[in-house]
From Swiss-Prot:
Species lineage: Viruses, Viruses incertae sedis, Halspiviridae, Salterprovirus, Salterprovirus His1
GO MF terms held by the record: glycosyltransferase activity
Enzyme Commission code(s) on record: 2.4.-.-
TM segment ranges: none
Keyword Transmembrane helix: no
Descriptive protein name: Putative glycosyltransferase ORF31
Keyword Transcription applies: no
């Protein structure tokens, strides 16, 4: 079956449905968002943000059409971190087990999802990103203007920033610069309480125009113990920023050009990033990586492969 033969109904879309439609627009796949008659299509693709997926899953369980779920982050761990009841967690695993396929954005997450739910038809489709649509951050001075963008709902995303803050603050105090953190969520108060005492670190809440914040930065920090392939890292690459992460397993195994550093070695890593030439080189590597791995054509073909595999098995 060729891509031209496949039709996909994208149901229960979140605010980021363009992460699917953009790459699919570069394929021969016919698709419709929020179709009135989704079961007239070859495949129903659920695009629910993680914690909103239970009701759509329950409805899809009775479908005669193959149902595929786009796994947005580590959704099963999200259920646990948000303190959902054990009943809801077991219900989610049960409903997930009736899926015909799942599409995470990186293989490690896919293996974990398969091991927990029993879903076997797992195929990876990453995120499409191009520097054409993002600012071109400038590297001309030695003063670091650090930026982090994250989801503040999960302690696994928040705690590493709190842990690294004393080390980063001391470095900035000696060398100048500032670290701005953007994002919203239920742990905003916790983050503010723990970072409010630093003169050179600011928790800024949600940014309406994040692109302008990237344009005014010259290095990204993405410190997390709860992620698959963060969209923010790709946005950093697209915005001509070098990206520094902590040695979380997903980052350590990642083949993209991020700079992984341990807590006590953050000084040395930040020191190297003071050099504008080093930042430009690292940032250029990120943009070249996007061109090689994250074009909409590449991601669209990844979706096509998953859909063909699901249809062949049904």
């Amino acid at each position: 079956m060729s891509g031209r033969d496949i039709s996909v109904a994208i149901q229960y879309p979140g605010s980021r449905v363009n992460r699917i439609t953009y790459p699919l627009s570069k394929t021969n796949i016919e698709y419709e968002v929020s179709a009135d008659n989704p079961f007239d299509f070859d495949i129903v693709l659920l695009d629910c943000p993680g914690l909103n997926v239970l009701k759509p899953l329950a409805k899809a369980k009775f479908s005669s059409v193959p149902v595929v779920y786009r796994v947005q982050g580590d959704v099963l761990r999200a259920f646990q971190e948000m303190n959902y009841t054990n009943f809801k967690y077991r219900s989610a695993k049960y409903l997930f087990s009736h899926l015909d396929g799942a599409i995470p954005i990186e293989p490690v997450l896919g293996r974990r999802f398969s091991n927990v739910t029993g879903v076997r038809n797992i195929g990876t489709a990453t995120l499409a990103k191009s520097e054409k649509y993002w600012p071109n951050a400038k590297h001309w001075d030695e003063s670091l203007r650090l930026i982090s963008v994250t989801n503040v709902n999960y302690i696994g995303k928040v705690q590493p920033m709190v842990d690294y803050a004393p080390y980063i603050s001391r470095f900035l105090q000696r060398n100048g610069g500032h670290w701005n953190i953007y994002g919203k969520g239920r742990l905003a108060g916790y983050l503010q309480d723990n970072l409010g005492g630093y003169d050179n670190i600011s928790y800024c809440g949600y940014a309406e125009d994040i692109k302008s914040r990237y344009a005014n930065s010259n290095c990204m920090l993405h410190l997390s113990n709860f992620d698959s392939l963060p969209n923010a890292i790709l946005e950093g690459f697209a915005s001509n920023l070098p990206v520094i992460t902590n040695p979380f397993s997903v980052f350590s195994d990642y083949h993209g050009p991020i700079e992984v550093t341990e807590l006590k070695k953050i000084d040395a890593k930040l020191c190297s990033m003071q050099d504008p030439t080093t930042r430009r080189i690292k940032a250029r590597q990120g943009q070249e990586y996007l061109k090689a791995k994250h074009t909409p054509e590449i991601v669209g073909e990844q979706y096509s492969v998953v859909f063909r595999s699901v249809l062949n098995d049904c």
